[in-house]
Amino acid sequence: MLSVEALEVRYGGYLALSDVSLHVAAGEIVCLMGANGSGKSSLMNAVSGLVTPAAGRVTFDGADITTVPTYRRLARGLAHVLERRRLFSYMTVRENLLLGAYVSAMRPARAETLESVLVMFPALRDRQSQLAHTLSGGEQQMVAIGRALMSRPRFIMLDEPFLGLSPRLVIQVGETMRRINAAGVTVLFTEQAIQQSLSIADRGYILESGRLALTGTSAELLANELLQRVYMGLDGATAIDDGADAARGADGAAVEEKEPR
């Protein structure tokens, strides 16, 4: 469904992604993991059209969308929930949600789609007139995901959906992602916590300093000795940040476990 081939992203002279390739099949939940600055958000921004790759190709449903404008990618069924939610703080919950249905083809079905979103997030039903900035972090995340669902996507990307949430809310958001997937929407999300992410995802990719370091099914990654030793540590810690420095060799180069070309 989604393929990224040899992607390179630059911000001026800074190389954020180098030669990154991945594939997400229809119906999957796939997690993109890595420490802060590893390139996770840059990859998602390139897929949704918020940044233009310096090299490489992005295809969606077999069509090359590398240079397609963001709004047209949305119309094709590709939605993106940005890191830190990015709601309109002084607009109501309802107003924020309805903005997700601005694509002309979705407007006639706004009422029906809004009802389906409120069924998925019942806590928002009685808060539709509440200003977004007065919501808790978990409620704001519900609004951000609901706004993306208003476009009726077939593929949704969530950038760090657990950021700043309590353990209880992390579980709730994870369950929501499974429900979205069960409804026929393919899911790609980013996260730093490995065990937590792989308990939700079918497969995962790990980025290190803008390059692909590891990939495999959730079971394969959890059983991988390099991942256990470098990223998770002997105590089973889940944060990739803890192992980021150890994942570099003596010369500072990232340790990668990929098949040679």
Name every feature range the model reports, one short phrase each.
Residues T52, D64-R85, R107-L114, D126-S129, ...:
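ABC ATPase NBD coupling module
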Residues L131-L135, E139:
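Conserved ABC ATPase signature
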Residues A148-L149:
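ABC ATPase C-loop
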Residues M33-A35:
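The feature captures the beta-strand-to-loop junction immediately N-terminal to the Walker
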